[in-house]
């Protein structure tokens, strides 16, 4: 455990249907580096997690509705995947606006699996290089992204990972890039 991110806040934007490990493991890595995380969602209370999109996998307590959140309060943003989670986020105007505004700040944004769907909806992928779950790559290319099949891709402020099998490398890259961005600021 280190304290490189002590005092820093990371927003995690997710809703019902989030892939449990894609929220839990990056959050754990950020906590291990000293960061504080807040779970933003479409509603208050709890969100239901899934395992491999099918099996119920417990719940996570929501800290704040995304409609009530400000990008100024956070040093980085994490967009975990699952199928249902980003599918709901990309149809919510508040979630899409939050993601678009966050990308506009230049602060780190990390996304894995199907999480980039929300970035595509926000219109912020044109000319960006990233990776994702294979099933959404055509959507990302249609949004103007250069999509590659790699474990983890870092393109400026954007850190992306393919899926659950790549979580160790993704988590390490997320912490590294947030630390690097904070050193530059």
Annotate each PLM feature.
Residues 1-105, 109, 117-129, 137-185:
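Extended, subdomain-level signal for the structured scaffold at the beginning of enzyme domains
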Residues 113:
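Catalytic nucleophile serine of serine hydrolases
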């Amino acid at each position: 455990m280190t304290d490189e991110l002590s005092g820093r806040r990371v927003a995690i934007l997710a809703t019902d249907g989030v892939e449990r490990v894609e929220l839990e493991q990056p959050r754990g890595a950020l906590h291990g580096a000293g960061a504080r995380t807040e779970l933003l969602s479409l509603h208050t209370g709890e969100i239901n997690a899934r395992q491999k999109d099918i099996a119920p996998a417990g719940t996570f307590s929501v800290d704040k509705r995304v409609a009530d959140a400000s990008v100024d309060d956070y040093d980085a943003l994490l967009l975990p995947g699952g199928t249902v989670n980003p599918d709901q986020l990309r149809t919510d105007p508040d979630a899409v606006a939050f993601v678009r505004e966050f990308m506009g700040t230049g602060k780190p944004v990390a996304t894995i699996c199907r999480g980039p769907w929300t970035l595509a909806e926000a219109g912020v992928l044109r000319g960006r290089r990233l990776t994702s779950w294979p099933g959404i790559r055509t959507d990302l290319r249609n949004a103007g992204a250069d999509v590659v099949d790699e474990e983890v891709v870092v393109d400026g402020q954007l850190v992306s990972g393919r899926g659950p099998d790549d979580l160790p490398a993704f988590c390490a890259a997320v912490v590294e890039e947030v630390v690097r961005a904070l050193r530059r600021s």
